């Protein structure tokens, strides 16, 4: 437990050191991409626990990200003042709908970001619950194709629906006031604060997942990955556990979708594309599959490089190549904790070999 | 909806359905010899179409198609030799991820060679407005080319597997790899061959439909998922049923356009895939008992 | 007193009647063995009892309640643990962690509680680890606690799997060929271990091929052949039963 606290503290120090470095070198604008990387990292962490630990592949996680992001964007930009009626005024009185000025000095009546966020995450969770049951009964290729299919459905729907802006997506999404004085917003004056807010969310998520991994639930998930029938025989309700971790994982993606959408001030269909889902999976793979820290560091580095445009027009190709190389040559991942465990295990076995 | 319009939808459905059937057959060939679902199957179709379009500028059409098919076949062989052949006991998860990676790689290479533009081969006979009247239905001659060539391919393939030594060796590998190896069949070569066959057939499919459906660097993924839907619908590994299931999906999709906006066309077929996977993963024609015995 | 009662259980696979109308009782506190030549339906019977397969017909009453039709994990929760013919240890987990999974039923922290690491989950985790170490002590594997389970010797892996089932604190323990693949010394050791488990007040039902093991430790033996029960008696009587001798020796299956 103390080791975990140290790891978290160490990571927080790294986050602070990066901010300091950008400040000292006069590259403060890099914080924008680093903030975005943080939100993508939330998706990656959620996928890591699902695919790496519980062994359930998903090639549709961008779908959950998009459900969260799009719904929050839609609710906070759709002008309800034209609708009138008692329901609208009632919601306005409860503070769920709030008035705010638009770009041209007019007045908009839109859903306040908090209820919008809650609704959006709730919707993603509901979808995950609904499809998770039948989807997670599938294994191997079938599971991969079904999750891929889910991702494609979400992508096609957002791309084909005028209400959510079709190919243009939704823009002019307002800032998200989390607490008085703290808002998720892309304004350059709030850049440093948002950097810390975003990584704060990641650290919080990391603490939750690390606790989970080390608990009885974490062991149950790993046992489902290792030998599902034996896990059943130990009294673990495997179907329910798979569904629950799928929902947790979808919730991480949806929260990330909501927050990044408010940070960017908009969302487009490319956020729900298959390529995004594959990208998350590639990061989990290179991070070492069942390795939260590996996934987190790889997500930080690769997303940052990608968002800064270092991969140029080879952006997607880079992730494709990474995926292939990892799977061909190091399918247990590059940053493997198991490697250390193996060395330690070997030493212990040698020591224990003297026993009769 | 009057009868003529109805038939018109059916014809459109058959055209698209044929290509889905061809992609599904590609899935089946590789699945049968290896137990792998090749997620890059749609990319073979795209590659065939794109290569033929480029070659058609300098070569006569039949030669361009032939060379495109050969090129794609070689790509299929290379993929197997470079990425699949030397893996020992790869897990299903690993194979899925590798073929997904390959699919992305092929697509990105295509993007850098050909750009984002949408291309098409010229119509084999006549132009896009030429049509033959059959009863009350106007049919583009290209539709006849698509259906005709596909039927010939399926027939040749059937004959190949049934009557030639090589085909029988491939079937032996599919039935029992170890036993086939004991009989002196090189299972590894059979796997390479299955990748070549499935790449070649996919490429040919890509060539013949490109005048109607067009082709661009990213047309592989939707084709792959629909081809997979069809392969599942027909029962994985069952090529004859795939052809029929392809028609079924094509026609369903074609009619869906009359009910829902065309932008949601893909949603329909993917939704069908999900429903089938949830309800009857052994396919419409397969037995549930057999599906459970397959290694997943 | 009967703890587990199997009544008229049948299961068919295609054209093969794998288990045909089998009935017998497992008395509380005893070691009952099911023997029979290869393909007699022993493992299928195990799968039927533990819920991994559904029978076509029949009834299984465990501790006075019908358990047929329940999911395997529900049956486990009622106090039945099992091992597998081919060891099914969890890879990438240590020996101790494998055992700890067996404590799942005796802890209750849910997803949210575990994520938040609430005080009660902390206490629970300590208790789980203590119980796990006690099991390792019992198995004599304390020294290997932190080794990766699947890297142990085969005999030790079988012990870990047994320990994992034991960690469930079952009322009845189903062992599917516990001596399969073990050498003579390991088999004898396994026999002693099973006897010691019975002393912990655990009823044992085992399927076994190794006659020496079965004859040494069982109180009651059920003989299956082609899915049917052909004999049920104490070991000394089974050894003299002409029908049993015929199927074991006459057909050369043993």
Set out the residue ranges of the language-model regions.
Chain A
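Transmembrane alpha-helices and adjacent helix-loop boundaries
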Residues: 1-356
């Amino acid at each position: 437990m103390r080791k975990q606290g140290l790891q978290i503290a160490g990571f927080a120090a790294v986050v602070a050191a990066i901010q300091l470095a950008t400040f000292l070198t006069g590259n403060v604008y890099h914080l924008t991409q680093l903030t975005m990387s943080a939100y993508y990292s939330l998706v990656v962490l959620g996928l890591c626990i699902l695919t790496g630990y519980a062994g359930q592949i998903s090639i549709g996680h961008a779908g959950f990200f998009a459900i969260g992001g799009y719904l929050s964007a839609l609710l906070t930009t759709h002008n309800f003042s034209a609708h009138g009626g008692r329901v609208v005024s009632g919601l306005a009185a409860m503070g769920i709908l709030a008035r705010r000025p638009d770009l041209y000095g007019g007045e908009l009546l839109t859903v306040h970001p908090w209820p919008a966020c809650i609704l959006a995450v709730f919707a993603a969770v509901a979808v995950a619950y609904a499809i998770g049951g039948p989807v997670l009964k599938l294994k191997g290729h079938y599971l991969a194709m079904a999750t891929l299919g889910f991702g494609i459905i979400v992508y096609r729907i957002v791309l084909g629906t005028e209400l959510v802006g079709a190919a243009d997506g939704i823009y002019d999404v307002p800032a998200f006031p989390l607490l008085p004085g703290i808002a998720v917003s892309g304004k350059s004056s709030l850049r440093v604060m948002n950097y810390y807010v975003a990584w704060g969310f990641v650290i919080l998520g990391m603490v939750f997942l690390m606790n989970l991994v080390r608990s009885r639930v974490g062991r149950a998930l790993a046992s489902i990955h290792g030998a599902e029938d034996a896990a059943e025989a130990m009294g673990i309700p495997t179907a329910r556990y798979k569904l629950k971790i799928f929902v947790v994982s979808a919730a991480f993606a949806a929260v990330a979708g909501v927050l990044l959408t408010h940070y960017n001030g908009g969302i487009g269909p490319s956020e729900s594309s298959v390529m995004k889902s594959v990208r998350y999976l590639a990061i989990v793979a290179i991070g070492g599959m069942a390795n939260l820290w590996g996934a987190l560091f790889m997500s930080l580095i690769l997303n940052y490089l990608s968002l800064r445009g270092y991969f140029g027009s080879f952006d997607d190709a880079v992730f494709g190549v990474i995926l292939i190389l990892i799977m061909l040559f190091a399918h247990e991942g590059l940053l493997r904790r198991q490697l250390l465990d193996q060395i330690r295990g070997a030493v212990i076995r040698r020591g224990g070999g003297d026993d009769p | 909806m009057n009868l003529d319009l109805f038939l018109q939808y059916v014809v459109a459905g058959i055209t698209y359905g044929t290509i889905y059937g061809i992609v599904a057959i590609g899935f089946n060939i590789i699945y049968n010899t290896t137990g792998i679902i090749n997620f890059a199957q749609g990319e073979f179709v795209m590659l065939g179409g794109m290569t033929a379009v480029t070659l058609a500028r300098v070569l006569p059409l039949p030669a361009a198609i032939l060379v495109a098919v050969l090129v794609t076949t070689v790509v299929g062989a290379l993929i197997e030799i470079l990425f699949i052949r030397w893996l020992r006991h790869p897990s299903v998860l690993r194979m899925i991820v590798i073929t997904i990676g390959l699919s992305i790689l092929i697509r990105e290479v295509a993007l850098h060679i050909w750009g984002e533009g949408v291309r098409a081969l010229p119509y084999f006979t006549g132009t896009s407005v030429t049509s033959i009247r059959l009863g009350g239905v106007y049919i583009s001659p290209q539709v006849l080319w698509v259906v005709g060539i596909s039927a010939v391919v399926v027939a040749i393939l059937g004959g190949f597997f049934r009557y030639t030594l090589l085909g029988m060796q491939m079937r032996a590998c599919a039935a029992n790899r170890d036993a086939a190896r004991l009989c002196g069949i090189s299972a590894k070569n059979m796997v390479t061959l299955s990748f070549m066959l499935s790449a070649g057939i996919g490429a040919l499919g890509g060539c013949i439909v490109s005048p109607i459906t067009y082709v661009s660097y990213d047309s592989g993924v939707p084709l792959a998922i629909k081809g997979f839907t069809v392969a599942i619908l027909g029962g994985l590994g069952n090529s004859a049923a795939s052809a029929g299931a392809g028609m079924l999906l094509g026609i369903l999709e074609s009619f869906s356009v009359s009910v829902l906006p065309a932008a949601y066309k893909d949603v329909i077929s993917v939704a069908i895939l999900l429903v089938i996977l949830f309800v009857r993963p052994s396919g419409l024609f397969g037995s549930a008992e057999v599906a459970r015995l397959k290694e997943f | 007193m009967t703890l587990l009662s199997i009544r008229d259980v049948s299961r068919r696979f295609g054209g093969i009647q794998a288990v045909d109308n089998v009935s017998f009782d497992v008395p509380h506190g005893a070691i009952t063995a099911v023997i029979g030549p290869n393909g007699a339906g022993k493992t299928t019977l195990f799968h039927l009892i533990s819920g991994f397969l559904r029978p076509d017909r029949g009834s299984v009453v465990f501790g006075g309640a019908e358990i047929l039709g329940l999911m395997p994990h529900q049956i486990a929760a009622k106090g039945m643990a099992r091992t597998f013919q081919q060891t099914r240890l969890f890879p990438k987990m240590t020996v101790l962690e494998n055992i700890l999974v067996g404590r799942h039923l005796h802890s209750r922290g849910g997803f949210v509680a575990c994520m938040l690491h609430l005080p009660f989950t902390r206490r629970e985790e300590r208790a789980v680890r203590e119980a796990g170490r006690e099991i390792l002590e019992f198995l004599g594997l304390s020294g290997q606690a932190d080794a990766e389970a699947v890297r142990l010797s085969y005999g030790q892996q079988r012990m870990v799997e047994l320990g994992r089932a034991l960690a469930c604190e079952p009322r009845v323990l189903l062992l599917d060929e516990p001596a399969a693949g073990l050498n003579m010394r390991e088999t004898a050791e396994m026999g002693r271990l099973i006897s010691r488990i019975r002393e912990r007040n655990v009823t044992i039902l085992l399927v076994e091929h190794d006659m020496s093991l079965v004859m040494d430790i069982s109180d009651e033996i059920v003989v299956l052949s082609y899915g049917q029960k052909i004999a049920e008696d104490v070991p000394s009587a089974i050894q003299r039963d002409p029908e049993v001798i015929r199927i074991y020796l006459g057909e050369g299956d043993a």
